[in-house]
């Protein structure tokens, strides 16, 4: 039997429990309040953090979208911009480097008055129908035939550049920079009777002018080019003797970085040959087609021909042997002797070439001749005697397989007198001749300089090909510079062997 709990103990116990309950309630309230405050702060932090993160994400996404949008727009513009990668900037040179040079046209070339040929933006006097021969030889009714002088290439090129579809006034957009310097006329007016200081004076001034231009620092001139109507050796005088020929333009440090386009190159890798100007400067594709049709179907009276003169004082010249064989060919060869005939008459020259199956192209004072392009224009198959006269010069224009459009006879065989031109050319089958002439006629649009403002039809002429290949060259050099490769030795200093004959047989389609 349990003992009864005393009443006092019960009262004390009850009071103690009550106090504990009161204290517990008070602490519980404090804890709850504290917890609520902490929770509120944490929530505020989390809300602020999340909001901040979301804002950063949104901002980042916004900027990314904007960047993507800009890039997409740029890509879209590049895709729609037909001039992307083709823009060319033409320096506005002081007139002392071009226009002022040709204003005094009479003394530009000693013993020859250049003034009559300056008209029509360098194309020369227009050839009009004066007799039946002119009408029969040329398609003069088109108004596209001119008495064009070969040395005016730089003037013709500059005029074409003024009409180039991707010419820009913003040099930062340009992929290449054209320097409209009349280097050929600058040197030719000082070749006789002037010392080397006078010959080099303007070139040195231009080098300094270029070096001070903001465009120069981009590639130090490796994206610059100029055009001349003279051969490369006129600008590579290695000594400073007054008796030495030419100027030292291409030996100046600045110009050693430039690319020169001229009618004939030396062995240096920063020179490229472009065609001599012909007499034909069409203004439409129809004119070209009409001319091609004419020369493709014309009946040719002579097996071969030679337009030129002997070079008795030139060591190693084969012209004497060529003339000898031509005169002894019993009517198979037509010889137009430029020592006694007017070889500046376009009608006379084109008549000879149009009447010939093959046209002989021996070297003269230098490797190349304007006659090469006049004969091709006439649909006459060229006969070369040195690789340096055509194959290793006009690499942008002629097929790599020279057998497709020409005949090659080594100079040595002509000197030895062991070759009969009449026999070699006479043994070529008619079927092959037709194939070769077809190829020659295909080349015609590539070797002529169309009139500025050519019709809407697109066909690449000599100017277009030169510009496109120049842009490709600059792009390659720029890529190599970005990769840290040596461009100087490969693209500017390296020499090539102009006498080497490289046999390449192209696959026929």
Swiss-Prot record:
- In the UniProt record, the gene name given for this protein reads GT12
Major localization class: Golgi
Keyword list (alphabetical) reads:
Glycoprotein, Glycosyltransferase, Golgi apparatus, Membrane, Signal-anchor, Transferase, Transmembrane, Transmembrane helix
User: What's any GO biological process attached to this entry?
Assistant: protein glycosylation
What is the protein name for this chain? Probable xyloglucan galactosyltransferase GT12
Which residues lie toward the Cytoplasmic compartment? Answer: 1-3
State the similarity comment.
Answer: Belongs to the glycosyltransferase 47 family.
Q: What is its EC number?
A: 2.4.1.-
Q: Which residues are glycosylated?
A: 27, 59, 65, 169-170, 195, 257, 416
Q: What class of enzyme is it?
A: transferase
Q: Which GO terms describe its molecular function?
A: glycosyltransferase activity
Q: What job does this protein perform?
A: Functions in xyloglucan synthesis by adding side chains to the xylosylated glucan backbone. Involved in the galactosylation of hemicellulose xyloglucan.
């Amino acid at each position: 039997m349990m003992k009864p709990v005393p009443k006092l103990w019960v009262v004390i116990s009850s009071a103690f429990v009550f106090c504990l309950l009161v204290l517990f309630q008070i602490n519980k309230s404090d804890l709850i309040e504290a917890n609520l405050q902490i929770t509120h702060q944490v929530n505020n932090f989390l809300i602020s953090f999340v909001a901040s993160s979301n804002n950063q994400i949104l901002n980042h996404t916004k900027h990314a979208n904007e960047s993507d949008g800009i890039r997409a727009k740029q890509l879209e513009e590049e895709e729609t911009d037909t001039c992307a990668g083709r823009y060319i900037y033409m320096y506005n040179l002081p007139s002392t480097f071009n226009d002022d040079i040709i204003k005094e046209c009479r003394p530009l070339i000693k013993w020859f008055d250049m003034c009559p040929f300056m008209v029509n933006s360098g194309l020369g006097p227009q050839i009009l129908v004066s007799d039946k021969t002119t009408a029969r030889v040329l398609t003069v009714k088109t108004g596209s035939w001119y008495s064009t002088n070969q040395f005016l290439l730089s003037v013709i090129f500059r005029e074409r550049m003024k009409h180039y579809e991707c010419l820009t006034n913003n040099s930062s957009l340009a992929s290449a920079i054209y320097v409209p310097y009349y280097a050929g006329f600058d040197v030719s007016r000082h070749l006789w009777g002037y010392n080397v200081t006078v010959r080099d004076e303007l070139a040195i001034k231009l080098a300094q002018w270029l070096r001070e231009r903001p465009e120069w620092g981009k590639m130090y001139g490796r994206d610059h080019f100029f055009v001349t109507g003279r051969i490369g050796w006129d600008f590579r005088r290695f000594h400073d003797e007054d008796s030495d020929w030419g100027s030292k333009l291409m030996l100046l440090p600045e110009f050693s970085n430039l690319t020169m386009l001229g009618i004939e190159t030396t062995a240096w890798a920063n020179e490229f040959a472009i065609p001599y100007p012909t007499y034909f400067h069409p203004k439409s594709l129809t004119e070209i087609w009409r001319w091609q049709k004419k020369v493709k179907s014309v009946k040719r009276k002579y097996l071969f021909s030679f337009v030129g003169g002997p070079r008795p004082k030139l060591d190693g010249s084969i012209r004497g042997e060529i003339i000898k064989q031509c005169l002894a060919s019993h009517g198979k060869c037509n010889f137009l002797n430029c020592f006694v005939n007017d070889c500046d008459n376009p009608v006379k020259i084109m008549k000879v070439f149009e009447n010939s199956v093959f046209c002989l192209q021996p070297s003269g004072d230098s490797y190349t001749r304007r006659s090469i392009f006049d004969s091709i224009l006439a649909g006459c198959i060229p006969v070369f005697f040195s690789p340096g006269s055509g194959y290793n010069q006009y690499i942008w224009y002629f097929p790599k397989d020279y057998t497709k459009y020409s005949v090659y006879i080594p100079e040595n065989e002509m000197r030895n007198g062991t070759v009969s031109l009449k026999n070699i050319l006479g043994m070529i089958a008619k079927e092959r001749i037709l194939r070769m002439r077809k190829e020659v006629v295909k080349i015609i649009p590539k070797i002529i300089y169309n009139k500025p403002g050519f019709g809407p039809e697109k066909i690449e002429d000599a100017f277009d090909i030169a510009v496109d290949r120049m842009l490709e060259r600059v792009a390659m050099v720029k890529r190599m510079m970005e990769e840290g490769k040596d461009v100087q030795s490969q693209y500017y200093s390296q020499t090539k062997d102009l006498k080497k004959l490289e046999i390449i047989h192209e696959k026929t389609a």
